[in-house]
Amino acid sequence: MAWRQAQPSRRQPAIFPSRTTLGRAVELLSHALFPGRIGAFAGDAAAEDRFVAERLDAAFTLLDEAIRAEFAYWQDVSAIDFAPERPAEILRLFAGTLSRVRALIDTDVAAIFRGDPAARSVDEILICYPGAVAILHHRLAHELDALGVPIVARIVSEIANERTGIDIHPGATIGPGFFIDHGTGVVIGETAVIGARVRLYQHVTLGARTPLADAAPGPRDRFARHPIVEDDVVIYAGSTILGRVTIGAGAVIGGNVWLLE
């Protein structure tokens, strides 16, 4: 009760973006990005174009609903007014990122296939591998976060966390060819920067050394507090790297390492 009493009163009940709605939106986007694999489409090119267009249209309808819910929330807690056309503009910009997102995911899947002799096909990777599921969600969430809908983006990332046990903040910047092997327990913080062709094993943490001091809820300054991992780094299972430290290109970090500097 003390916490509740300390908060500013709300003008109306909070309505947040729906987890179910966003889960379905990501599913539809996955079908559109990989129609012949995740979408299970079979047909000629013209039919495939229609399939993709229908999935994108349905996904954008759901995303529009979620974005409007987030804007209503922020407008209530901060009294910020948003232009009515802003959700449509965000969706337009997000749509423009999808070809780049698809290309990045292709590099991630290729890295997994090269790095795991147990992988029999890229189809198996896209459908079964938790690292592939997590990075697909992250690539989409990262674009949404950059476009100014952090709650929508965070829900997308948490859907992946629930499914895979891999926790990647949508603010984290991750280069091409990213491979999380096994994946359970991996944590990547908001301001982490990861280069190209990086491989992480299970239970790796790229975290911050200290939490924010107790402060009133609301907008906070976002400062760089998570590691920088340069190109071609391998970090083995159970290692914890905290703070704004830099892991140089080509480094190999052994298992169960605790690294602060």
What are the language-model segments listed below?
Residues 161-261:
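Structural signal for interior beta-strand "rungs" in well-ordered beta-sheet cores
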Residues 1-158:
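Terminal amphipathic alpha-helical/low-complexity segments used for targeting or macromolecular assembly
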